[in-house]
Amino acid sequence: MGRTLPALLSLLVLSSISLPRGLGKDAETFLSLQSRIQEIFKQSEKSVVRVKAAREQKADQKVRRMLKMGSGFFISKEGHVLTTGLLKDPDRIWIEHRNSYFLAERIGHDPLCNLSLLKVSKKPLDFTYVSFSKPKEELAVGSILVGVTCALEFKIAPTYGIMQSHEFLFGKTLFPTKMIRSSLPLGLGEVGAPVFDLQGRFIGITYAALPDLGSSFLLPASACSRIRDDLLLSGKVDYGWFGITVNRTLNKDNGFEILIDDFVEGSPGSKSNLRKGDVLKKIAGTSIRSRGELAQASFFARPGTFVEFVVERDSRELKIPVEVALRPMVPKNILAENGSLPDSNLTDSTNVGGNEDINGSQTP
């Protein structure tokens, strides 16, 4: 019977069917799940839009018109829409909402995470928006997720999957912050959509597809909130910077630890009481056990503030305040224009889940 449960779940989510006798409580569970997915879809469908961006490009005395589309969703009653970057420097942006079309302008863009904040010139008469609430605890592996997306020119529809893992890396490429890997299948036009848990809480935005694995990456709600706030305020995102170079090395317990290797000249790290060889333990109360967690700390650090570094030096634990500076240069996002992660990151030596160069360095 265990093998029949996933198949029955898929059938029940897609349509109402007659349940075979004898399933008992399992049948009630299936119907409850189906009903909950339908409720989440009904609650959120008026907030989701299809976003289109067009740009004219002249080449060889010919004008080529480029059109990209994706999903997006309202995040305020004023008509702000969060979506992916779509096209670089588009000539025109518009959204489709319940068979109506609305012009939009780009308020701001974050090249690091490839998110854009739009605002419609005229608000729809009947729309809702997605609220960002901070979850009390981290999303557990195996949690059921519900996405509401705009695939190609089809109607807005729900899709579902499970939370598979939290990831900091894709091959040897370091994500700007911790990502959620899910089993949500993403096709064309479905990047930029909101994803919810079964309580209807916003979990994240569809960020990138992994079609060969039947998986996808979601940018978590906490990161979306960080980006949204800065884009609303200034149209750009100011990320923090410590100016330290680190190495990941084996310790005496055959585990890994993060050592400070060097400092960028004139950086906050170089001006602090941190020293080369210090073992990083915590930043702003968060444990640092990998380069990904260091990148995460840098992602959420606000320029102009101080954060507390906890380091181990000569078998002693020290607490050292470090001022956060504005990151001098924001790298481009790693996504291809279609919302997929480039195949060049997946080679025999850099495959997902493969061995990582433990002596690699990073300067957050």
Language-model features and meaning:
Residues 8-16:
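Bacterial N-terminal signal peptides
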Residues 21-86, 92, 140, 144-145, ...:
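N-terminal activation segment of mature serine protease catalytic domains
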Residues 27-28, 56-57, 74-157, 188, ...:
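Conserved active-site neighborhood of the chymotrypsin/trypsin-like protease fold
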Residues 46-51, 72, 79, 83, ...:
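Terminal peptide-recognition signature
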